């Protein structure tokens, strides 16, 4: 039996190896004799449950041209694609959701509120793109060799 320096407590194996009495140094941590020899148990907290925010519901809309897009059900605005203005509305979407077949409704009529022409009947308004040129533009040809910068000029620009 080994006592501490003050002679008040019996030292355990761990305290003998450390060379000091933990009960004398830290009396607030020890209530009884058994607590000095046992190690405290560490309890793990359960992981905090976090819920991911709900994603906004979207509907897939397949256009007659073969293109598809996803539109939010709360979006009442439309968009123009290949010259045709497409507008999707919530009642159409809810009616489509009740049925299994997506092609039950006729195509919606588009109202432009008198702002301009209706482009519903025009199917192809795409214009051919100009051919790409291989040479340099005329402006650079007129300037000549003003764009040749020497290595010493580059160093002065970088500094």
Swiss-Prot record:
InterPro entries: Gemini_AL2 (IPR000942)
Annotated stretches, region: Disordered: 102-139
Residue ranges annotated as motif Nuclear localization signal: 43-60
A GO CC term attached to the entry: viral capsid
GO molecular function, one term: zinc ion binding
Annotated signal peptide: none
Ranges annotated as biased composition (Low complexity): 110-124
Entry's Gene Ontology BP terms: symbiont-mediated suppression of host innate immune response
Keywords: Host cytoplasm, Host-virus interaction, Inhibition of host innate immune response by virus, Metal-binding, Suppressor of RNA silencing, Viral immunoevasion, Zinc, Zinc-finger
Main location: host cell
Top-rank taxon, per record: Viruses
Subcellular location: Host cytoplasm
ZnF (unnamed) intervals: 65-81
UniProt comment concerning the protein's domains: The zinc finger is involved in PTGS suppression.
Biological role: Acts as a suppressor of RNA-mediated gene silencing, also known as post-transcriptional gene silencing (PTGS), a mechanism of plant viral defense that limits the accumulation of viral RNAs. Suppresses the host RNA silencing by inhibiting adenosine kinase 2 (ADK2), a kinase involved in a general methylation pathway. Also suppresses the host basal defense by interacting with and inhibiting SNF1 kinase, a key regulator of cell metabolism implicated in innate antiviral defense. Determines pathogenicity.
Subunit and interaction comment: Monomer. Suppress local silencing by interacting with and inactivating host adenosine kinase 2 (ADK2) in the cytoplasm. Interacts with and inhibits host SNF1 kinase.
Protein family according to the UniProt entry: Belongs to the geminiviridae transcriptional activator protein family.
Protein name: Protein C2
The species this protein was found in: Tomato pseudo-curly top virus
């Amino acid at each position: 039996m080994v006592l501490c320096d003050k002679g008040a407590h019996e030292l355990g194996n761990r305290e003998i190896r450390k060379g000091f009495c933990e009960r004398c140094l830290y009396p607030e941590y020890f209530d009884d004799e058994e607590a000095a020899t046992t190690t405290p148990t560490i309890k793990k907290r359960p992981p905090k449950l976090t819920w991911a925010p709900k994603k906004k519901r979207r509907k897939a809309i397949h256009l007659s041209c073969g293109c598809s897009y996803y539109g939010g059900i709360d979006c009442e605005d439309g968009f123009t694609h290949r010259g045709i203005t497409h507008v999707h509305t919530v009642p159409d979407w809810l009616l489509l959701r009740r049925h299994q077949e997506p092609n039950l409704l006729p195509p919606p009529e588009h109202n432009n509120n008198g702002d301009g022409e209706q482009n519903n009947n025009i199917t192809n308004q795409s214009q051919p793109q100009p051919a790409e040129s291989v040479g340099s533009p005329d402006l650079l040809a007129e300037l000549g060799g003003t764009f040749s910068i020497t290595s010493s000029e580059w160093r002065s620009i970088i500094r």
